[in-house]
Amino acid sequence: MELQAARACFALLWGCALAAAAAAQGKEVVLLDFAAAGGELGWLTHPYGKGWDLMQNIMNDMPIYMYSVCNVMSGDQDNWLRTNWVYRGEAERIFIELKFTVRDCNSFPGGASSCKETFNLYYAESDLDYGTNFQKRLFTKIDTIAPDEITVSSDFEARHVKLNVEERSVGPLTRKGFYLAFQDIGACVALLSVRVYYKKCPELLQGLAHFPETIAGSDAPSLATVAGTCVDHAVVPPGGEEPRMHCAVDGEWLVPIGQCLCQAGYEKVEDACQACSPGFFKFEASESPCLECPEHTLPSPEGATSCECEEGFFRAPQDPASMPCTRPPSAPHYLTAVGMGAKVELRWTPPQDSGGREDIVYSVTCEQCWPESGECGPCEASVRYSEPPHGLTRTSVTVSDLEPHMNYTFTVEARNGVSGLVTSRSFRTASVSINQTEPPKVRLEGRSTTSLSVSWSIPPPQQSRVWKYEVTYRKKGDSNSYNVRRTEGFSVTLDDLAPDTTYLVQVQALTQEGQGAGSKVHEFQTLSPEGSGNLAVIGGVAVGVVLLLVLAGVGFFIHRRRKNQRARQSPEDVYFSKSEQLKPLKTYVDPHTYEDPNQAVLKFTTEIHPSCVTRQKVIGAGEFGEVYKGMLKTSSGKKEVPVAIKTLKAGYTEKQRVDFLGEAGIMGQFSHHNIIRLEGVISKYKPMMIITEYMENGALDKFLREKDGEFSVLQLVGMLRGIAAGMKYLANMNYVHRDLAARNILVNSNLVCKVSDFGLSRVLEDDPEATYTTSGGKIPIRWTAPEAISYRKFTSASDVWSFGIVMWEVMTYGERPYWELSNHEVMKAINDGFRLPTPMDCPSAIYQLMMQCWQQERARRPKFADIVSILDKLIRAPDSLKTLADFDPRVSIRLPSTSGSEGVPFRTVSEWLESIKMQQYTEHFMAAGYTAIEKVVQMTNDDIKRIGVRLPGHQKRIAYSLLGLKDQVNTVGIPI
């Protein structure tokens, strides 16, 4: 009776917890639902009439059914409950959800020694329905079902039954149908719900691709690849991948690959491609919306891929379809020709109508006419231009070597990118008459061993315009020196010449208008005296001896002077006593040496009016204030260029103002392709601003972290070469940067790297208390050479050390040098001889160069000129970059890839992925079934690719980290 009461009590209390089931992910297709059948299924019990029993209860005026069994007082129970035959259909893997309660064995008298608290779940596949024919041997055990919670006596008293929900899956199934069976071996169980279903990945529209409803696969670790179909008017972009997604076993879509884009003439509207409206166009398959037809185009029809130009307007072949149609420019404005002796200077102003383009160039042609005959012809071959006469961008040119008494006509044509599409020309002409004298006709009148007498003549009509003649002469073969004599007559004697020597002589008339045409260059030779052969030998020997004595004296003087200089230098200065100091290079001038910093700003920078500058958005914050992206009007006012704008914050101190202007005074002295370019300053208005060129990709360290693994080794070495070239330029100007790091390198859209940030304070040189402090914060210990940290000795050699750290940052895609070590630990490690290990996939030659930069003795480090030369050789011979340096992932990936903060293995996969900065792949690992560290350490390289890690750099980072992870797991004894 007590057992019957227990079963009845279960029937009354089971519904209190039934509503706790969670919705399954994906789409579920139900094959069997006991609770929904309302007791009409009529399952088979064995033995019949014993064990399992169908019970009914009324709850909320609705009948509720369950199968229960509670033969706990009798031993050797073997009670079976079998479902009806279930048709499998298209299912490959089925999921079985059970809701049940189990009573605590201790709630029965004497503890019921034969009582159990579990039951077994079985299944059997078959192609036929066997009806009531029940054979145990056909069934295969799925699992022993144990409750998470059991119902104890106090739960009965409180009318609270603890409901358990368990789910199991079976697959792959191959027969037409199947049975489920439940075996009781002596428990008090109430089976409230049995739901059997399989999962599908639902129909999906994503990335303009349609993915059909797909049955989830039967193999849990694998993902079923499903090809998508582009929607109407969408295509796979050239070079792109066909759209694919992966259907996981739980019915979830994972790992999307590829995409579709709306074709030319169509734009994306929600999940479809819609034709461009009239007046709009789209010229290629892309994610961009349709664009409005630009200026000077005709209205386009619906779905247009381009907009036709209006009559008289054109589009050059290289012009994008989004650019307005343009036309050839008008003629140059205000052409003038000013004669200056045998030269003419042509000047003009730009066309009043540029045609809507900025690529205006000019061509100059010349025609000469003889006054006597009136004949004219081209004269390009006989005149000389100050620069090539075609493709000029300036608005002036000088034409020389013009002939006297000749009329010249010069034509200046303006052209732009569409001028070649029309036959008409836009030009202006100017004529000028040359009244310059004819070249003098020179002849030799006499000569001796030490002199030459020459005379000349010009036509009588021109003699009245000449006020003097200029005679230029020099030894043949000597291009370094010459002599000039001026005279009012028509002859001259050149004295004090060397015997038996050939001289080059030219005569030129000087008029009020300037120099006239020069005569031909004549060769005249002095006479050889008697015995000139012996004298020449003796003279040559004497001259040679004298020269040797002079050179010896000069060499001795230089040696003594250098020796004295070295004696005055400290041992640390040996590096700077190289010959490069003797080169006549431009030298950097420290703006802080000026009593008034405004003087340095005026000398080295360009003042810009605030009206020429527009601030658009904040892109960062510097030491002195905010940094903006903005636009700067060019001097012509017709064009704007993007710039970066540093501002001086309100409430600045006088020292901050001096430092702010000092940085501008430094930048203004530099002009190099790999140094950030200063456009100008605003120092006369508030807020004060420093305007530099705009670098689209920002700081190098952040850029590399965002593009991890996307560049080839050759591209990375090219970036390093650019940085080294900029530093070579600074070193040649005797400028020491002191803060060279990837964060202070800016990258433009063409991947050109430029050195920036010249604001590091000078306090280090003057204040012995400021060992680790600048006006902007701490000294960058991780990038700074040991001698600079210890003795505040900043030199070009310490910049070379910093460049080695930058090389390491670039090759590791922006990793933090020395990882999480403290500054004190970094300094100690360096002094103990530790150097950063080789990065992953780093060429041996590059790592060797890093190690040279990190020589403890700074005199042994290479100069930047040497570094540029080495990198140039590597770039010219890419095969030399294929030999990789030895790589130990246990040292080189120092991110905590094998242990957590307490030195123990990671508890979760997501925690491990986050530690190696690969957390973006967490869902990929989870979807593929790698939910625990024990499973992850068994992965192969193919497994990493299969879950959707596509970038080679990311694949290697994960693979190398797994090596260390396996070692750690094996060390602590976690079973795998």
Curated annotation (Swiss-Prot):
Glycan-carrying positions: N407, N435
Expression triggers: Up-regulated by UV irradiation via a TP53-independent, MAPK-dependent mechanism.
GO (cellular component) term, any one: receptor complex
Keywords noted in UniProt: Angiogenesis, Apoptosis, ATP-binding, Cataract, Cell adhesion, Cell junction, Cell membrane, Cell projection, Differentiation, Disease variant, Disulfide bond, Glycoprotein, Host cell receptor for virus entry, Host-virus interaction, Kinase, Membrane, Nucleotide-binding, Phosphoprotein, Receptor, Repeat, Signal, Transferase, Transmembrane, Transmembrane helix, Tyrosine-protein kinase, Ubl conjugation
Motif PDZ-binding boundaries: 974-976
Domain Fibronectin type-III: 328-432, 438-529
Span of domain Protein kinase: 613-875
Entry PTM: Autophosphorylates. Phosphorylated on tyrosine upon binding and activation by EFNA1. Phosphorylated residues Tyr-588 and Tyr-594 are required for binding VAV2 and VAV3 while phosphorylated residues Tyr-735 and Tyr-930 are required for binding PI3-kinase p85 subunit (PIK3R1, PIK3R2 or PIK3R3). These phosphorylated residues are critical for recruitment of VAV2 and VAV3 and PI3-kinase p85 subunit which transduce downstream signaling to activate RAC1 GTPase and cell migration. Dephosphorylation of Tyr-930 by PTPRF prevents the interaction of EPHA2 with NCK1.
CDD domains per the UniProt record, alphabetical: EphR_LBD_A2, FN3, PTKc_EphR_A2, SAM_EPH-A2
Claim: DNA-binding is one of the keywords in the record: no
Membrane topology note: Single-pass type I membrane protein
Signal peptide: 1-23
Broad enzyme group: transferase
Domain SAM: 904-968
Residue intervals annotated with topology Extracellular: 24-537
Region (Mediates interaction with CLDN4): 1-206
Tissue specificity comment: Expressed in brain and glioma tissue and glioma cell lines (at protein level). Expressed most highly in tissues that contain a high proportion of epithelial cells, e.g. skin, intestine, lung, and ovary.
Subcellular location field: Cell membrane; Cell projection, Ruffle membrane; Cell projection, Lamellipodium membrane; Cell junction, Focal adhesion
E.C. no: 2.7.10.1
Mutagenesis or variant effect for K646M: Loss of kinase activity
Protein function: Receptor tyrosine kinase which binds promiscuously membrane-bound ephrin-A family ligands residing on adjacent cells, leading to contact-dependent bidirectional signaling into neighboring cells. The signaling pathway downstream of the receptor is referred to as forward signaling while the signaling pathway downstream of the ephrin ligand is referred to as reverse signaling. Activated by the ligand ephrin-A1/EFNA1 regulates migration, integrin-mediated adhesion, proliferation and differentiation of cells.
Protein name per its UniProtKB record: Ephrin type-A receptor 2
Native species: Homo sapiens (Human)
Gene that this polypeptide is encoded by: EPHA2
